[in-house]
A protein has these predicted regions:
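Short hydrophobic/aromatic patches at helix-to-coil boundaries
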Residues: 143-147
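Short glycine/serine/threonine/alanine-rich loop segments
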Residues: 34-35, 111, 142
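Small/aliphatic-rich secondary-structure junction motif
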Residues: 3-52
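Glycine-rich, Arg-bearing micro-motifs that act as flexible, cationic patches
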Residues: 113-135
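Short, structured coil segments at secondary-structure junctions
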Residues: 32, 132, 139-141
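Charged, low-complexity cytosolic intrinsically disordered regulatory segments
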Residues: 2-3, 45-114, 125
Length: 147
């Protein structure tokens, strides 16, 4: 008996590892005839840089579009793609972490399967999504693939 998977959520940042994780999400979506949603997670440091004028908002948007484009290139025609963005941390909400953002988005979108990368492009676990993976694995009510 096949699992009932209609929407796969893949959490991504601008790293190659996130795109690799999205490729797994594509394979799952294709296998189960599901749709794919990319959730772009922004690091608080990036948002502070944008707010301070040190980082161009257009550059951040270009990076997100590039990731979406790389995923779209690999996407079969049978898989519908949607995407959204969220900030991984909030100075106003102490409980808002990258992991909680992924879980909240999964609940809001009614995602049936989650895919999160464990390590960022720098290879350190200090990056946003690397930290999120453990939280998502521990608290998700959906199946999770962490790659």
């Amino acid at each position: 008996m096949d699992a009932d998977i209609e929407l796969v959520l893949a959490a991504v940042d601008s790293s190659d590892e996130a795109v690799d994780a999205a490729e797994y999400a594509i394979a799952i979506a294709e296998r189960y005839d599901a749709d794919l949603h990319l959730l772009h997670i922004l690091d608080q440091r990036v948002m502070r840089g944008v707010e301070a004028g040190d980082v161009s908002a257009e550059t951040v948007a270009d990076q997100q579009r590039a990731v979406t484009g790389r995923v779209r290139e690999r996407l079969p025609e049978t898989v519908a793609l949607s995407h959204s963005g969220a900030v991984g941390f909030s100075p106003n909400r102490l409980g808002q972490t990258p992991g909680s953002v992924v879980l909240d988005a999964a609940e809001e979108l009614e995602a049936d399967f989650l895919v999160v990368p464990r390590v960022s492009a720098s290879g350190t676990r200090d990056e946003v999504l690397g930290k999120a993976a453990l939280h998502v694995l521990e608290y998700a009510s959906q199946p999770v693939l962490s790659v």
